[in-house]
Amino acid sequence: KIIGTPEGFYDEDDPYYFPGAMADRSIEWLHGVRAQDAHKPFFVYYSTGCSHAPHHVANEWADKYKGKFDQGWDKLREEIFARQKELGVVPPDAELTPRNEAFPAWDDVPDKLKPFYARQMEVYAGYSENADHNVGRVINAIEELGELENTLIMWIWGDNGASMEGTVTGSFNELTMQNGIPLTDEMQVQLSERYGGMEQWGASIMAPHYGAAWAWAGNTPFQWGKQVGSHLGGTRNPMVLHWPARTTDAGGLRSQFAHVIDVAPTVLEVAGIPAPRMVDGIEQEPMHGASFVGSLVDYSAPEHRTQQYFETIGNRAMYDDGWLWSCRIQRIPWKFDPETIAHFAPGKWNPDDDPCEL
């Protein structure tokens, strides 16, 4: 359904914010469905832009995290790792992968620039909490309708690992990286000042992205992030499932391997609907995914998937029955300059004139 743009789009006193509008319209739609039919099942696909760049959020959200990241990304990564052990997400004897030399040590960042970097993560955190808040509004609406216990909710946080495309410095405008424009952190600060300074970092006047080392911390315990499909830091995302009517171990963990292509078959099985063979008169290929309903209701269920291939920009991996084969190309995610890309340019030759591929 089209959300539309309100007349007061540029109202400074009450600015329009798309994530909030998404929640408003989703709630409106849910109440409309129930008003028409008290028993009709419903399906909502709520896909927020968060936490993809640009990181846009009002200061009232970002400011909640002032000072929360002054310890820097190295310490933050250690803190996250400790919490993961407490939660049982990683084994108690697991060791944290070391920082790659591509990421600067927080202690090496000049003191005058640390507030610049810390604000980047404050904005990202506020952006993330706002998304969580709006999802919560939709879930509260489902509860108000009396349907929460019997509704399967899949909350998938992301479509890849945290993005390192903000480069080492972070950027007041994410398009600088995409256009191969190298900027130092001091240049980023100077350019930010032209648009109102760091207090405007999450505002609509900028298109900000945080520094790659913050993404590295966010991807704890993994090594890399988005674009590096050879490693779990590039492909793995948290998923929270809520279905009180069928699950009995609230807060339980699952270790069975699953892939995003398994979501649709799972939803169809839960709804008791066969996969469509025809859509708009076009015959459909069989779905490649496999339902994970078994592991959803039983933590000891056997693996439903034993193989999966991954590939992103030449980085590739193969999961096979508990093992992961990986091959990473020697390019870090934020390097798009001509000299770097030249190493990966395709070759060409005429096999008639050059049979030996010289």
For every predicted segment, state its role:
Residues K1, K40, Y45, P54-A62, ...:
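Short, solvent-exposed loop/turn and secondary-structure capping segments
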Residues K1-A62, K66, Q71, K75, ...:
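Formylglycine-dependent
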Residues K1-Y10, G67, I139-N140, L175-P302, ...:
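Substrate-binding rim/cap in mid-to-C-terminal beta-strand-loop elements of soluble/periplasmic
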Residues Y17-D24, E78, E122, E129-G136, ...:
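A structural signal for well-ordered alpha-helical segments within the folded catalytic domains
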Residues A35-Q36, S51-V57, N160-S171, D298-R305:
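Secretory-pathway/luminal and periplasmic proteins that interact with or process carbohydrate-rich
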Residues A38-F42, V90, A94-E101, N130-V168, ...:
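Metal-dependent active-site segment of extracytoplasmic phospho-/sulfohydrolases and closely related
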Residues F42-S47, L152-I156, P221-Q223, M239-H242, ...:
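Structural recognition of the beta-strand scaffold that forms the well-ordered cores
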Residues H209-A217, P221-N237, F310-L358:
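C-terminal, low-complexity/hydrophilic appendages and adjacent surface loops
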